[in-house]
Regions:
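Periplasmic/cell-envelope proteins involved in peptidoglycan metabolism and beta-lactam response
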Residues: 1-294, 316, 395-405, 446-448, ...
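Beta-lactam-recognizing serine transpeptidase/beta-lactamase-like catalytic domain environment
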Residues: 2-8, 118, 217-222, 226-230, ...
Length: 646
């Protein structure tokens, strides 16, 4: 068999022909694909260039979602403006004098803006002039063809038609480099909500931007979409929001607080919907819109009256006598006091005596009616120093837990930015300050009447009144009830938050609050035959005149509104806070106000320092926190006045 292995192979001429044939077919296909690419891409690009057309990528900014009040009234909408864009490489010789005249800018400004645009990119578009109004754009548009390399970018800006609710609605501003680095969605020139609803609901309001590719001729005129718009993306408008606010009530409350410093928060107890949230002094939200936004923001920021400061959620105040209600509720639940527990008109601590107006021993309902300091100082002492807890530290720790169940000393989850939790000191705080085992209720007794080291904001005060109105629970206070066509379900708003106090213990508290309005310290708050439950307060202020406080809800049997009013440096709660709250409740429940004399007195009231009368935006330099430390280690209540706190 010695045949060579190569002899087994046979020559087949057909195989070689097949390879040649396949090679020809492959070459034809490759040539066809190259030609197709040339015809569809390169040749079209040459065609665009040959006719002096260029491609321009234009961002389509979505319309920001509108905001309505609870009755369907628009409180925030959009108006058209135009940004003038520039691509430096495409700019040819232009008549800069005419250009500057049309835009009402100087030649120096023109040069500066061009240098900035070139520094950013010679090839990419950047903003040359922001937010040109529709009126100015109309005259400029006719001559835009003369200025090659420039084009107009349509967009919208906010408009707030009622000129109110600045702290609730918030404002928007341009994103900065830091924000862009954190969130890849945003690009240079985008706007974002910075405060209020605009910030909290940015994702729902902003929508989704789109991009159009258009052809532009040598005369700077758009000649239509590139390739029929197949590469365009459509902008998606933001979702509309329905707020819980009553715009009329909000405006009325702002009017009543004019020339005063303070806050009002009104909530619907049965839902947690915020009906009004007012911080005074305030500002017109339209000041922070448009080309003058930066200038106006600088003015507001430097204003010593701090109009940008949201006192409703960020200011700490001693709650004063309004805090007696939660003090009593904790003691009732623990069996420390009963509805018939009585106490005389004097409370003695060492050599000090805290007195009320002379009266025989009174029970809880009467103590609430007459705001008896000795009664509630004793209630606090009886709780904290009670032997069944083993020590004053344990008693105070439990008392503090009760207060926190009312939303004190913690964030209650409002759907607004910058909520502060307030202040209610811990056992560790007092141990550190006085020394462990060296303090007891008599050292910090002023907490029992809402003084001392307490700091609560008006939102928390209003929420406490919702709890009392509901007999033991609250819904998370919120400002948005509907997103698009659907209820707001983003924050479990329908969930009830219960306190540590049983429902039956609230009846006696409501009885006492009703007597406050009908025959006690807040008779001025009565109107019609409506049953109102309220409590006045006069909170000591270490920096000046006492603060005026009033909290209330109405009607008693079917609460529709709970309200907290704080007027700084205004004295007794019945003088200013109670009338303002009463007028707002009347406005909301009756839709009109009949007590015109009282209304006129509140409107004319000027409670600001005389030296500020000349200011455009009058107000008072706010104290960011009234959570003062004890004045000495012997007695944190040394400043407590021997007078009845109304």
């Amino acid at each position: 068999m010695g045949t060579n292995s190569y002899s087994l192979k046979m020559y087949n001429p057909g195989s070689s022909q097949r390879i040649v044939f396949l090679g020809i077919i492959t070459s034809v296909v490759i040539i066809f694909l190259i030609r197709l690419f040339y015809v569809q891409v390169i040749n079209e690009s040459y065609s665009v260039s040959a006719t002096n057309n260029v491609l321009r990528y234009i961002t389509d900014y979505p319309a920001r979602g509108m905001i309505y009040d609870r009755k369907g009234k628009i409180v925030a909408f959009n108006q058209a403006v135009y940004d003038l864009m520039v691509i430096p490489k495409q700019v040819k010789e232009i008549d800069t004098l005419e250009f500057c005249k049309l835009l009402d800018i100087s030649k120096e400004s023109f040069i500066d803006k061009m240098n900035k645009a070139t520094s950013f990119s010679r090839m990419k578009a950047s903003t040359f002039e922001k937010q040109i109004s529709a009126e100015s754009f109309a005259s400029f548009q006719e001559k835009l063809y003369k200025f090659q390399g420039f084009y107009v970018q349509p967009r919208t800006l906010r408009k707030y038609p009622n000129n109110t609710a600045a702290h609730v609605l918030g404002y928007i501003g341009e994103v900065n480099d830091e924000l862009i680095a954190k969130n890849p969605y945003y690009r240079i020139g985008d706007y974002i909500g910075i405060s209020g609803i605009e910030q909290s609901y940015e994702l729902e309001l902003r929508g989704q931007r789109g991009v159009r590719i258009v052809m532009v001729d040598v005369f700077n005129r758009e000649k239509g979409s590139y390739k029929g718009g197949i590469y365009d993306t459509i902008a998606i408008a933001g979702q509309n929001l329905v707020a819980t606010l009553d715009a009329d009530l909000q405006s009325y409350g702002e009017l009543l607080l004019q020339n005063k410093i303070g806050s009002v928060v009104a909530i619907e107890p049965q839902t947690g919907e915020i009906l009004a949230m007012i911080s005074s002094p305030s500002y017109d939200p339209n000041l922070l819109v448009g080309r003058v936004r930066s200038k106006n923001y600088g003015y507001l920021l430097k204003d010593e009256n701090k109009p940008l400061f949201n006192r409703a959620m960020q200011a700490y105040y001693p709650p004063g006598s309004t805090f007696k209600l939660t003090n009593a509720l904790a003691a009732l639940q623990e069996g420390i006091i009963g509805i018939n527990t009585s106490y005389p008109h004097s409370f003695v601590v060492g050599s000090k005596s805290i007195k009320c107006h002379p009266h025989p021993p009174i029970a809880l309902e009467g103590a609430i009616q007459y705001s008896c300091n000795p009664y509630f100082c004793n209630t606090f002492r009886s709780f904290v120093d009670n032997r069944k807890y083993g020590s004053s530290e344990n008693g105070y720790r439990l008392w503090r837990e009760y207060q926190m169940s009312f939303g004190v000393g913690k964030k209650i989850g409002v759907d607004m930015p910058h909520e502060l939790k307030g202040l209610i000191p811990t056992v560790e705080f007092y141990d550190k300050y006085y020394g462990k085992g060296r303090w007891k209720a008599s050292t910090i007794y002023s907490l029992g009447i809402g003084q001392g080291e307490l700091g609560i904001n008006p939102m928390q005060m209003a929420n406490i009144i919702c709890i009392i109105a509901n007999k033991g629970y609250y819904y998370t206070p919120h400002v948005i009830k509907q997103i698009g066509k659907y209820p707001n379900t983003t924050r479990n708003l329908g969930e009830r938050h219960y306190t540590k106090v049983s429902a039956e213990n609230f009846t006696i508290i409501q009885d006492g609050m009703q007597r406050v309005v009908e025959a006690g310290t807040a008779r001025i708050a009565r109107f019609d035959s409506l049953v109102i439950c309220g409590k006045t307060g006069t909170a000591q202020n270490p920096h000046g005149k006492d603060h005026s406080l009033f909290v209330a809800f109405a009607p008693r049997d079917n609460p529709k509104i709970a309200i907290a009013v704080m007027v700084e440096n205004a004295g007794f709660g019945a003088t200013w806070a109670a009338p303002i709250a009463s007028l707002m409740m009347e406005k909301y429940l009756k839709d009109s106000v009949k007590r015109h004399d009282l209304e006129e007195r509140m409107l004319k009231g000027y409670l600001l320092p005389l030296q500020n009368k000349s200011l455009e935006n009058p107000g008072l330099k706010v104290k960011d926190s009234t959570s003062v430390k004890p004045k000495n280690k012997k007695d944190s209540s040394v400043a407590l006045l021997n007078k009845k706190k109304k």
